[in-house]
């Protein structure tokens, strides 16, 4: 009947609204974690630089400053996660945009979550600090939680 169909549509809208709120709360946490990485990155780089210097000193190697700079630049490039952080910010903006659409977006969000996961994995693999590694794991947990929620939307 028309009433039953209207009720079903209304129930689905209400459920969609609840899921949207849950996803937005998770997105807010993702954004906070990204900001946290950006904030601790300079200290992590400095700490990593100090470790490299200490290793050279411990080995009692008389290394010229150019060689030390080359080694340091190599490790900084390996640990540079700015691109991944920028992409995570872009993905959060895109997900917010999709959540505000009235058309079905489940498949698009699912694809976007794969991109989120890729960035979180790269962040973890490039990590030069335990704190950044932990944040990477926290990001993956939040991404998984969002993916679970989108299984319930169209």
Spell out what each predicted region is.
Residues 1-154:
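N-terminal intrinsically disordered, cationic/polar leader segments
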């Amino acid at each position: 009947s028309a009433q039953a169909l209207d009720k079903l549509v209304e129930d689905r809208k209400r459920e969609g609204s609840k899921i949207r709120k849950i996803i937005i709360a998770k997105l807010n946490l993702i954004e906070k974690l990204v900001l946290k990485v950006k904030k601790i990155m300079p200290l992590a780089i400095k700490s990593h630089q100090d470790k490299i210097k200490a290793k050279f000193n411990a080995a009692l190697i008389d290394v010229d400053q150019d060689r030390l700079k080359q080694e340091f630049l190599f490790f900084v490039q390996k640990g540079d996660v700015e691109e991944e952080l920028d992409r995570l910010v872009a993905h959060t903006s895109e997900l917010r945009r999709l959540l505000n659409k009235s058309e079905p977006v489940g498949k698009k969000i699912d694809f976007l979550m794969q991109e989120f996961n890729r960035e979180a994995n790269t962040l973890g693999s490039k990590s030069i600090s335990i704190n950044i590694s932990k944040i990477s794991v926290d990001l993956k947990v939040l991404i998984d939680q969002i993916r679970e929620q989108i299984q319930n939307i169209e």
